[in-house]
């Protein structure tokens, strides 16, 4: 995984998308992937994103609200790797998975949700976390594509 990531960083640098030392960039990314969090932590991260970057418990603004559209767009299009499109079609939720089996998903202005449960599928996403989040989101009406019947 680190070797593939380093190769990706070198490729992005060659195209002018990354400045600086590829080894340092990969080290920083690897350390970010190694941060220990639990489901409650991930849920608070997701809730903060759903609340336009403001922590719903502390009221502290942690992410610039102007950055939220870009963050959610990247989550929607790449957050579940090769299955991002399938996930978005099924749930309508921007999401991000991690190699430890965690997934966060966001219904902007409504809720953020998280689940952790290995094992991973072929795309690198938790099988059970996907199912749990999809089921809970459906029960809460989180998919904006299913918000109202079409043609009525």
Regions found by a protein language model. Give the residues of each.
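Single conserved hydrophobic/aromatic residue that forms the stacking wall/gate
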Residues: 1-10
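Short, contiguous, pocket-lining structural segments
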Residues: 4, 33-41, 63, 128
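Short glycine-rich loop/turn motifs
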Residues: 7-8, 42, 99-103
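Acidic-glycine-rich active-site phosphate/pyrophosphate-binding loop
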Residues: 11-24
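Flexible glycine/proline-enriched surface loops and loop-helix/loop-strand junctions
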Residues: 23-31
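A short glycine/serine-rich beta->alpha loop
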Residues: 31-33, 120
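Structured C-terminal helix/loop/strand segments within mature extracytoplasmic catalytic/sensor domains
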Residues: 48-152
